[in-house]
């Protein structure tokens, strides 16, 4: 194993030992502008759990008044002097849903609504981390490629912190998400091509002009931001973990981060059980799940799903994602676009949670897994909704339908509702 420029005396990260390549094991000092290993592998942040256990307890956390992702600073790779980012990211609600649990034959079911974050998606957790690390690196410009949510989250978090942004999106990105970028003042490049072509263009620009890289599979710190969703779930459940945790999967960064957070908590003794992960992908694009189901290395796939945020045919964080699913003895579940839209409507009508298609893919997978007997009766499950439904209104209308459109006539209203099997009494 090669060790590159490791000097714990000089690093400002007292809780971090190093960054280690998940492919070859090479280690690097955890400097702010880390990217991939020289072998092309993805880096993983390695923590000093003895140091963390000496400085971080459940009692410390219980007494901490900070309802954001930064309440877990001891488990995050940021310098002590780095300020919390301006937007209030994290500490999203975890709703218990007994009605839906009964419908699915589950013992208990919780829905984590990360669509309430500042730019309406879980990606705010990664972007807040990117802003913090860009601050440490002394950067002025942050850039990324994205199918939508990472872009809007970077644009918003960077705007609040005073950074300039360049954001590359495939031209199929929903207009609602692109509108967010423009409102936040991002310099937006709509690329005539798929996500892979968009990613390559962003990588070339970042290398050419030296911008801070917010691309999740290149920057190892971003999954550390995303892992805070699992830290919150554990704390909100009073450290009693469910049997399963379901989440939608695109490039693999989120599910990898979720698993990293759970392992961190297990390593410091905050939890004594690790849930099995449910990796949810669309049948229109499921390269990570296919690798699990066929027990072979992942291969690129075409991108053909309404769940745009997880429509990633070449997942850049596949190595970490596959490790997470396999280590957790997880389940890979593919769902159709029709099942995704049905889950969107089901969540809205039973739980009052409005998620975008990619955001509810985890719930669609839970439903399908229950129906197929992959999840046992009476099991406990957390399903994470990763993005708000207002980001993609066109598909929400496909799911829920149009309102009745009539003249101002109550009798006509009753008549039209009757055609839909709805009464006014």
Locations of the language-model features?
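Generic short N-terminal amphipathic or hydrophobic helices
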Residues: 2-3
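PLP-dependent amino-acid enzyme catalytic core
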Residues: 6-425
């Amino acid at each position: 194993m090669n060790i590159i420029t490791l000097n714990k005396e000089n690093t400002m990260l007292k809780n971090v030992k190093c960054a280690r390549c998940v492919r070859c094991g090479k280690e690097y000092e955890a400097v702010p502008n880390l990217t991939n290993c020289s072998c092309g592998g993805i880096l993983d942040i390695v923590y000093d759990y003895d140091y963390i256990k000496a400085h971080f307890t459940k009692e410390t956390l219980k007494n901490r008044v900070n309802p954001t992702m930064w309440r877990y600073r001891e488990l995050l790779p940021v310098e002590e002097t780095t300020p919390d980012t301006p937007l209030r990211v994290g500490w999203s609600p975890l709703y218990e849903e007994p009605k839906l649990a009964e419908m699915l034959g589950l013992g208990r079911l919780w829905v984590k609504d990360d669509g309430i974050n500042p730019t309406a998606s879980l990606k705010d957790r990664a972007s807040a981390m990117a802003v913090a690390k860009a601050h440490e690196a002394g950067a002025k410009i942050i850039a990324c490629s994205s199918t939508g949510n990472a872009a809007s989250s970077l644009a918003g978090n960077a705007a609040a912190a005073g950074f300039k942004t360049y954001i590359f999106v495939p031209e199929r990105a929903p207009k609602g998400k692109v509108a967010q970028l423009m409102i936040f003042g991002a310099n937006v490049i709509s690329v005539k091509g798929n996500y892979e072509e968009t990613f390559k263009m962003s990588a070339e620009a970042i290398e050419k002009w030296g911008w801070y890289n917010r691309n999740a599979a290149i920057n190892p710190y971003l999954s550390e931001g995303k892992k805070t969703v699992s830290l919150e779930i554990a704390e909100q459940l009073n450290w009693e973990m469910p049997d399963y945790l379901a989440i939608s999967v695109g490039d693999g960064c989120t599910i990898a981060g979720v698993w990293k957070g759970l392992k961190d908590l297990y390593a410091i003794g905050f939890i004594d059980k690790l849930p099995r992960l449910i990796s949810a992908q669309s049948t229109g694009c499921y390269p990570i799940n296919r690798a699990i189901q066929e027990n072979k290395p992942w291969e690129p796939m075409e991108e053909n799903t309404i769940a745009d945020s997880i429509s990633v045919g070449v997942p850049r964080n596949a190595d970490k994602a596959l490790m997470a699913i396999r280590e957790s003895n997880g389940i890979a579940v593919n769902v159709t676009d029709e099942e995704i839209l049905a889950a969107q409507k089901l969540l809205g009508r039973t739980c009052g949670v409005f998620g975008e298609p990619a955001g509810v893919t985890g719930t669609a997978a839970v439903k399908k897994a229950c129906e197929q007997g992959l999840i046992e009766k009476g099991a406990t499950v957390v399903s994470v909704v990763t993005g708000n439904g207002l980001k993609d209104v066109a598909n929400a209308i496909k799911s829920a339908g149009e309102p009745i459109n009539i003249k101002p006539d109550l009798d006509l209203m009753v008549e039209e509702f009757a055609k839909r099997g709805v009464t006014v009494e």
